[in-house]
Amino acid sequence: MPTTLHVYLEQGRQKVFANALDWPGWSRWAKTDEAALDELLAYSQRYGEVAVRAGVRLPAAHDVVVVERVPGDATTDFGAPSVPAAVDAEPLARPDLVRQVSLMRASWELLDSVAASAPESLRKGPRGGGRDRDAVLDHVREAERAYARKLGVRHPPYTSPADVAAMRDELATVLLSGAAQGPWLPAYAIRRITWHVLDHAWEIQDKSG
């Protein structure tokens, strides 16, 4: 397993994302490069739970190396990692691809587990804003359906949990088979999908108390 934490920084005007290249979904933002790296490392333990579910060992300590800085865009400043790294254009080696897809699957498992134990009504912000549990889940699932289209995977609107599982299985299969067709690079797609799932799984956890 990688022990050096290779990170690329996605630098928007208002937000900077620190993205762990070898660990899809482990992406956090702050207002400066240094703060974004600190925020990334602050989530090491939480991301470690995902690695355990995937059967992958996350090293306890990391030698952080920033390998690239890319300009962010409006989506970066909105709060989502939006710009691929240059290395994403290179095909992932088979073991790395399998490992990263397993981490994506583990993020789905974590979200399902968190949702199953969360209250239906989540704690709101100071002005009463924010989604409740089921609305968060609906948002994640619909976003995934849109993301999947960027890889050539098209599914009609969901009518049951089985439809969600089928779409996710097809998405993982397409990524593993190298059959993805669309504007998103596979490495970036795995990172973005996994980040979105984890960001909302952690949101549900944080707002369940």
Segments (PLM) and residue ranges:
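Short, contiguous alpha-helical
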Residues: 6-8, 14-33, 37-56, 101, ...
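A non-catalytic, amphipathic alpha-helix used as a structural packing/dimerization or gating element
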Residues: 36, 103-106, 110, 166, ...
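Short, charged, surface-exposed hinge/linker loops at domain edges
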Residues: 45-96
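Charge-rich, acidic-biased intrinsically disordered regions
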Residues: 64-67, 132, 163
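Long amphipathic alpha-helical segments with strong coiled-coil/leucine-zipper propensity
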Residues: 93-105, 116-117, 122-123
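Transmembrane alpha-helical segments of integral membrane proteins
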Residues: 171-178
